[in-house]
Amino acid sequence: MYHQLILMALIGVIMANVVPFSMSNIPEEYKEFIPEEVKNFYKNLTQEDRQILRELASKHATFTNEDAALEALKNKSDKLYQKAVELRNFVKAKIDSLKPDAKTFVDEIIAKVRSLRPEDGQKLDMEKIKQAARDIIAKYEALNEETKEELKATFPNTTKIITNEKFKRIANSFLQKN
């Protein structure tokens, strides 16, 4: 179960760092698990910034990749673009510091999480999210101990999150098969 909690926290961290992503899409009971860097990014947004992010998030399917989304953001607001790039670089530096096995694992999680984004006007599909979490947990459990330790060291907020009793209850209930 400990490994599952690590993975759920890691998924949360990565989901929160996918740009553009709206904090309003995160249920209140999960917001406490979002890293401070991400909270600060969204907390310091103006109403205009929020509107720009909502507009771009609604068009996420039209962007071929993250760079295209950032370019669209730059065209709307250079200041917001700079903030987003700073947040992206923070996450990218952590990921780039990983050894190949850990980096591949994180890259796969990011791709999986991005694939879960709903189309315009659609809600998140909780069953797809649960299945994705199960798939990621299986991949995590197949990693060697050195890679698991590296992931824990690189994402220290995960340790704080997984020791939180509330998070453990949420993770257990979330992954229950219906």
Swiss-Prot record:
GO molecular function: fatty acid binding; retinal binding; retinol binding
Residues of this chain annotated as glycosylated in UniProt: 44, 75, 157
Primary location: secreted
Transmembrane segments: none
Keyword Zinc included in the entry's annotation: no
Entry keywords, A to Z: Coiled coil, Glycoprotein, Lipid-binding, Retinol-binding, Secreted, Signal, Vitamin A
PTM section of the record: N-glycosylated.
Disulfide bonds: none
Lyase is among the record's keywords: no
Function (record text): Binds retinol and different fatty acids.
Family: Belongs to the fatty-acid and retinol-binding protein (FARBP) family.
Record's protein name: Fatty-acid and retinol-binding protein 1
UniProt source species: Onchocerca gutturosa
Organism phylogeny: Eukaryota, Metazoa, Ecdysozoa, Nematoda, Chromadorea
